[in-house]
Amino acid sequence: MCICHVCKRPTFLDHQGSQHPGAPFGAPVGDVPEASVSQLYEEARRATAAGAYTAAVLCCRMLLMHIVVAKGAAENQTFLAYVEFLANKSYVPPEAAEWIDHIRKRGNEANHEISISPRTDAEDLVAFCEMLLRVIYEFPARAKRRGGGLSGAT
């Protein structure tokens, strides 16, 4: 047993060299004002680290719903309506629409079918959600702290 140098909590390596509990997948994202959004993202990160990949995929699906409602969409819409809201309000670049649709499809599979989500799906979706949170929350907050723009911008 060891003590993690980051969180200062106990951790151990099993006979295969795997760390338990594992470090959360992805990186923390700052400046997210909605507690539910931040909590769901962290839950998806921890679920991925724990090998609970289907749970992580479902968290990412729910996370997108929370983001969209926080940004002004009506509650109790279809997931497709939420995906379209993100695209129509330019919260994601056109090239990212394919990723949003990927989350929709993987989330639907995990939510409505008898299936198990693989590690790759969970990691891809958490990484996409991390990027989305940075674009929607973290980078605008950074710019605001710097006085509304980045230094050297013309």
Listing of model-derived features with the role each one plays in the protein:
Residues H20-P21, V69-R106:
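Short, charged amphipathic alpha-helical segments flanked by flexible coils
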Residues E98-K105, E109-T154:
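Charge-enriched, short contiguous segments at helix-coil
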Residues M1-Y53:
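Charged alpha-helical initiation segments
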Residues E43-R46, A50, V69, N88, ...:
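General structural signal for alpha-helix termini and helix-helix connectors
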Residues Y53, A73-N76, S115-R119:
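Alpha-helix boundary/capping and short turn/kink residues
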